[in-house]
Amino acid sequence: MRLWSIHPAYLDPAGLTACWREGLLARKVLLNQTTGYRNHPQLARFHCTDPSAAIDTYLHGICDEAHRRGYRFDRNKLGTDDPALQITVTDGQLAYELEHLRHKLLRRSPETALLLPGAEPDGETGTTERCDPGPEKQITIRPHPLFSVTSGPVEPWEKIT
């Protein structure tokens, strides 16, 4: 299960669809409608004051991106969106997720990997490598609309692979 903290605009079609499906599964877990995945680390950040509102707001963000692309994700499966709700995520987590996504995209959708922040095509091989912008230029990684960014390392709930 991967519930991306980065903005869904970075995801390719397969990634966006997988995020939607895994988000719906996460919703069932958080609403106690299934017995599996209860201790999944990706769900830790959604165990806040109102887990239902948090996951529904997350999924509405995924739905918004899908709608922007012309996909038809069924918003009727969700509860109410709470645009005022914010969960913090560290910039280290966003950077980790962007690199994790980059590695996935290099295998299944190299042309999409070129669109990620900090990507630079290799002129000889046509592959995409991470571009080190140096200390004078910081790469901005947009978070999913549910998340507000704070400075810090990769989140403790992340299983680093």
Show where each model-derived region lies.
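Sequence termini and other peripheral, non-core segments
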Residues: 1-16, 22-33, 47-161
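Short beta-strand
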Residues: 35-37
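Conserved, mostly hydrophobic/aromatic
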Residues: 40
